[in-house]
């Protein structure tokens, strides 16, 4: 369009407009869109100046409008002619941001001349905007009949074009009741048989909109096209709904009468098996029901017709309390005792929905009161649950004998109306029922009395009324089918006020069939207020056991109620083991109840809780070990408590931290028992070994554990390891001296004579050095003998585990080869065997020396890294082997004239050497090429290029990448590996060291001064290279200010809650004294905040009571609505 405007405004293409004067452009302030008005009076230059004025057009750029849209909307035909002259047809159909063309704008503004002009110029009338509206649909919506006529007369207009939701212009005409437009469309060939996406025809739309004139035209035109009025008026949509159904939904009595006069079938049912009569009955449209019933000429009983739920018209009227309609239906013969698919009569349905006018009407008409639904409930069961209960019935009905007999009638669960009233918490209904001398001892099939229901749901006022006139405590202490008394049920659901009332009335602390007391139930739910009421009444009940030996502490810990556990501990509840040898702390740990464990740790009775366990239990071990396995974060908190900082300033020289180690190891008296009891093995450093077993690196790195290991290391670990290292050096150093001082390849003995082996001449050892060499040989021999003895002892100690450690096999190789190397002291052996064993021995001696250095932190980490990288190399051996075979054999075929590749074995070895970078390109490839010795030069060099790419580049980089990744992984877990070795070392040492020595050096705690040096200069220098590094640790701040403030706010809220409850009780007493009737008098719902979750969980359980609760709480209002057409 913009290109068309530019063509219009070009000087060479400008056309003269005769007799027209352009007078400028003004803004129409009355128009909501501030559209332009352009008056053309002949001055073409001023028109050009207006179009070039971008400032005035800028405010329409958001909608992407052009001048032609506004000209069409204003009916400026001359300006439109000027704009489109010289333009293409595309300019006529240009769209704004909403998909509207100039023709849409003209139709919307009822500009007939603009529509005519645009159509004459070739505008497309069938284009639809974003709302699927064509210009014809817009004209129909605006009831612009002239525009409709112009559009329909145009040959290109599709009269049956579908718009929004599949509606044609004919459907929209019926919705507007525009009979003139309908006549125009029908004459131009609009189809009456075309439906929208819901299957509605124009006759449906006319019926729903109450368009009587359009309905008449549609039926008349249908007769002309071969459809009778009766057949046409009974067309159905996708839901099988006829026009009569839609007319009833709209509530237009005249339209309904017109449908009936045209032959609409009253008994026609839609998909939900509902007649139009059921819709009318639901709405309470008495006049419509009367009209339809009086118009029905069929043979069936239309008054008692049922829908898909087997509900009659009277059921529908009863559900929504349509009193007049129900009275009329009864008068014309409606069955007042018919039942629906759930066995509900109109009386039961009206009672469930609190339609009291209908209830009283049905009772006055003699409705049967003994009819029960499929749950066995009569209307009285439902009446007592409603607000004001029996007060809603007329007094004369309550005097009827057959109604009085219903008070003891039971449903399928054996519950009487009194059970229902007590469960719902309706004190007024309870009072009314008790006036009929109803027995409060009546039981349901699960042996529950009304008091059980009232106590279970916290109905305090109901409980007070039931217990008001009792003379004994039999009702209080009766158990149900599971042996649960009202006290059990009230405690189970956390109703502390009910529990207090029952205890005051004489309820006993009995156990149910599972051995659970009221305290067990309250602790399982975590109801601390209820527990406090019980404990204040009977303190000894804390130690009552159920059939499995569980106390209330076990229940609270299993469910994770930390506050309940804290309360029971504060009331000095005994810490006992159940039949599975588990204390409450074991149960909390196994179920990962973090808050319970933390609460127990902070308790004053923590040490007592820790000591309750059996040493021979396989699944319930020491709680510290269980804590490390299941809840390491709690163990961290416990270790934090073992760090006790001093009160001095942290920068002071006297500032110190005391580290307590009592939770990290069993007492020495238990680990060093001469005769183990009950086959229990007490190992040293038990807790640290469990940490290593479960990879608890965060615990092993805790300051307390580090100080504990440092204490062990300084006490005996460092000395023992240095002694072990020194004894190993007694064989390593002499062996090294022998290898260095003696020329390889010569056989020697104790006399210093050298036998000729490889050399062709004889040589002699310097006689001055023969004695030192003899001493070295003896030391190597003795160290090997000592090593043999040590390994044999280890075999008996470690048994099968000895053979699983590859270090032991390495030491056997060292001692054997070194002994063979020095065996010429006693025997003559060949020199080649002697020196081969010597090479093996010296190699493994120094390699094993690296493993000894793993114990030291600074150098041990690098040795661990070397070990892991070597394992990575072994994992990639498969790739090496195949590449070695591939290239080695290939080079053997191509280069077998060279000595290095003359045999397959030598070729493989040379290829392995080339893998390390020793390719020897000049001697092996280049010079043979110049001497024409290569039989296949192209293939040979191609193989060399492939080898270079695969091995030195790709494979080596792959190994480097794996090594780097493994190094990062080792660095991540290096601390765990190092500490694991330290723990293993100290564990093995403590097993071997005597008890008197351990008792002397072992410490229960240690005090560290962070601001003072811990060792002398020489010792610090030595520790820097070999020993564990010291890192300064800060003692954690356990009690933060934020926690204290939250605790203060918590107690303040409790005080406010208590004050409000007292004021509430006082106001209730004032109301009773002044005899004020309150709307809340009938409410009996005292649900505290702490038991709200428990109540919601009970309501979510599947029960037959759910239907009753839903019917009482909400009134279902079925709104019959029809989709927009």
Swiss-Prot record:
Post-translational modification comment from the UniProt entry: TRPA1 activation by electrophiles occurs though covalent modification of specific cysteine residues in the N-terminal cytoplasmic domain.
Membrane-traversing stretches: 722-742, 768-788, 807-827, 833-853, 877-897, 938-959
Keyword Zinc: no
Sections of the chain in a coiled coil: 1044-1073
Keywords assigned by UniProt, alphabetized: ANK repeat, Calcium, Calcium channel, Calcium transport, Cell membrane, Coiled coil, Disulfide bond, Glycoprotein, Hydroxylation, Ion channel, Ion transport, Membrane, Metal-binding, Oxidation, Repeat, Sensory transduction, Transmembrane, Transmembrane helix, Transport
Gene3D superfamilies, alphabetized: Ankyrin repeat-containing domain
Phenotypic consequence of residue 918 to E: Ca(2+) permeability is greatly increased
Annotated intramembrane regions: 905-925
Pfam families registered for this protein in UniProt: Ank (PF00023), Ank_2 (PF12796), Ion_trans (PF00520)
Family in the record: Belongs to the transient receptor (TC 1.A.4) family.
Protein's UniProt name: Transient receptor potential cation channel subfamily A member 1
Gene from which this protein is expressed: Trpa1
């Amino acid at each position: 369009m913009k290109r068309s405007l530019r063509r219009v405004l070009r000087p060479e293409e400008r056309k003269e407009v005769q007799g027209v004067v352009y007078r400028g452009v003004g803004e129409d302030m009355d128009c909501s869109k501030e559209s332009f008005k352009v008056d053309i009076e002949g001055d073409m230059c001023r028109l050009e100046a207006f179009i070039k004025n971008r400032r005035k057009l800028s405010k329409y750029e958001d909608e992407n409008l052009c001048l032609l849209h506004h000209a069409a909307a204003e009916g400026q035909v001359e300006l439109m002619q000027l704009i489109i002259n010289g333009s293409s047809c595309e300019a006529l159909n240009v769209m704004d941001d909403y998909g509207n063309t100039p023709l849409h704008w003209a139709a919307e503004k009822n500009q007939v001349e603009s529509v005519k002009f645009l159509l004459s110029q070739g505008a497309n009338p069938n284009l639809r905007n974003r709302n699927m509206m064509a210009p014809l649909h817009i004209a129909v919506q605006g009831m612009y009949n002239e525009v409709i006529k112009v559009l329909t007369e145009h040959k290109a207009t599709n009269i049956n074009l579908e718009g929004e939701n599949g509606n044609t212009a004919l459907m929209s005409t019926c919705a507007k009741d525009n009979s003139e437009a309908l006549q125009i469309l029908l004459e131009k060939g609009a189809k009456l048989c075309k439906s929208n996406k819901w299957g509605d025809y124009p006759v449906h739309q006319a019926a729903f909109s109450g368009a009587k004139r359009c309905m008449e035209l549609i039926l008349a035109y249908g007769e002309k096209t071969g459809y009778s009025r009766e057949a046409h008026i009974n067309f159905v949509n996708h839901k099988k709904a006829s026009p009569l159904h839609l007319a009833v939904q709209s509530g237009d009595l005249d339209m309904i009468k017109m449908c009936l006069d045209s032959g609409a079938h009253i008994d026609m049912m839609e998909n939900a098996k509902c007649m139009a009569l059921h819709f009318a009955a639901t709405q309470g449209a008495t006049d419509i029901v009367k009209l339809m019933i009086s118009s029905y000429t069929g043979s069936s009983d239309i008054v008692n017709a049922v829908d898909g739920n087997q509900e009659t018209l009277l059921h529908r009227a009863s559900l929504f309390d349509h009193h007049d309609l129900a009275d009329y239906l009864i008068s014309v013969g409606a069955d007042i005792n018919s039942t629906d698919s759930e066995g509900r009569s109109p009386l039961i349905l009206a009672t469930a929905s609190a339609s009291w006018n209908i209830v009283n009407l049905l009772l006055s008409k003699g409705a049967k009161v003994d009819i029960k639904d499929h749950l066995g409930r009569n209307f009285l069961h439902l009446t007592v649950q409603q607000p004001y209960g029996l007060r809603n019935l007329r007094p004369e009905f309550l005097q009827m004998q057959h109604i009085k007999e219903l008070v003891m009638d039971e449903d399928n669960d054996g519950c009487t109306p009194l059970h229902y009233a007590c469960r719902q918490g309706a004190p007024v209904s309870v009072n009314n029922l008790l006036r009929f001398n109803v027995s409060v001892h009546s039981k349901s099939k699960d042996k529950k009395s009304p008091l059980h229901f009232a106590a279970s749901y916290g109905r305090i006022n109901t409980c007070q009324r039931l217990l008001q006139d009792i003379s004994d405590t039999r009702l209080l202490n009766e158990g149900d089918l599971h042996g649960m008394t009202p006290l059990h049920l009230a405690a189970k659901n956390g109703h502390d006020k009910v529990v207090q009332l029952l205890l005051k009335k004489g309820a006993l602390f009995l156990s149910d069939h599972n051995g659970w007391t009221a305290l067990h139930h309250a602790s399982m739910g975590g109801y601390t207020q209820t527990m406090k009421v019980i404990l204040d009444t009977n303190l000894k009940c804390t130690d009552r056991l159920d059939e499995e030996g569980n106390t209330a502490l076990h229940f609270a810990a299993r469910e994770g109620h930390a506050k309940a556990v804290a309360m029971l501990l504060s009331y000095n509840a005994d810490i006992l083991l159940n039949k599975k040898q588990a204390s409450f702390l074991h149960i909390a740990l196994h179920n990962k109840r973090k808050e319970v464990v933390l609460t127990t740790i902070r308790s004053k009775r923590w040490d007592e809780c820790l000591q309750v366990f059996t040493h021979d239990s396989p699944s319930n071990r020491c709680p510290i070990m269980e804590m490390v396995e299941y809840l390491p974060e709690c163990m961290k908190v416990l270790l934090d408590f073992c760090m006790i900082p001093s009160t001095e300033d942290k920068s002071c020289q006297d500032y110190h931290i005391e580290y307590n180690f009592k939770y990290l190891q069993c007492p020495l008296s238990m680990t060093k028992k001469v005769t183990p009891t009950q086959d229990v093995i007490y190992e040293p450093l038990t807790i640290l070994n469990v940490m290593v077993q479960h990879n608890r690196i965060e615990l092993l790195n805790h300051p307390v554990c580090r100080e504990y290991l440092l204490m062990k290391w300084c006490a005996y670990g460092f000395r023992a390891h240095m002694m072990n290292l020194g004894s190993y050096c007694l064989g390593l150093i002499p062996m090294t001296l022998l290898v260095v001082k003696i020329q390889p390849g010569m056989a020697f003995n104790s006399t210093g004579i050298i036998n000729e082996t490889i050399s062709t001449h004889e040589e002699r050892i310097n006689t001055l050095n023969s004695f030192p060499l003899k001493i070295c040989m003896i030391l190597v021999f003795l160290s090997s003998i000592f090593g043999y003895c040590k390994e044999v002892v280890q075999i008996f100690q470690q048994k099968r585990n000895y053979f699983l450690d590859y270090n032991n096999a390495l030491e056997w190789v060292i001692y054997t080869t070194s002994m063979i190397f020095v065996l010429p002291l006693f025997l003559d052996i060949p020199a080649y065997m002697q020196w081969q064993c010597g090479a093996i021995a010296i190699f493994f001696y120094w390699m094993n020396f690296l493993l000894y250095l793993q114990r030291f932190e600074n150098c041990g980490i690098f040795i661990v890294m070397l070990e892991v990288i070597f394992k990575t190399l072994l994992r990639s051996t498969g790739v090496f082997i195949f590449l070695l075979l591939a290239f080695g054999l290939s080079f053997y075929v191509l280069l077998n004239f060279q000595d290095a590749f003359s045999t397959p074995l030598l070729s493989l070895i040379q290829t392995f050497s080339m893998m390390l970078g020793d390719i020897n390109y000049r001697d092996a490839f280049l010079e043979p090429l110049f001497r024409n010795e290569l039989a296949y030069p192209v293939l040979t060099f191609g193989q060399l290029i492939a080898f270079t790419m695969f091995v030195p580049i790709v494979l080596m980089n792959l190994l480097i990448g794996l090594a780097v990744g493994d190094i990062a992984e080792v660095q991540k877990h290096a601390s765990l590996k190092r500490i694991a070795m330290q723990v293993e070392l100290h564990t093995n040492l403590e097993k071997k060291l005597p008890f008197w020595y351990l008792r002397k050096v072992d410490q229960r705690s240690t005090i560290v001064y962070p601001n003072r040096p811990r060792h002398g200069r020489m010792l610090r220098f030595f520790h820097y290279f070999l020993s564990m590094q010291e890192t300064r640790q800060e003692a954690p701040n356990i009690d933060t200010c934020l926690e204290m403030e939250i605790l203060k706010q918590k107690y303040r809220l409790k005080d406010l809650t208590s004050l409000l409850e007292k004021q509430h009780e006082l106001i209730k007493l004032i109301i009773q004294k002044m005899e004020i009737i309150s709307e809340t008098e009938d409410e009996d719902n005292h649900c505290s905040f702490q038991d709200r979750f428990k109540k919601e969980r009970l309501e979510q359980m599947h029960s037959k009571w759910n239907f009753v609760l839903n019917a009482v709480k909400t009134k279902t209002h079925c709104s019959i609505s029809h989709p927009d057409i």
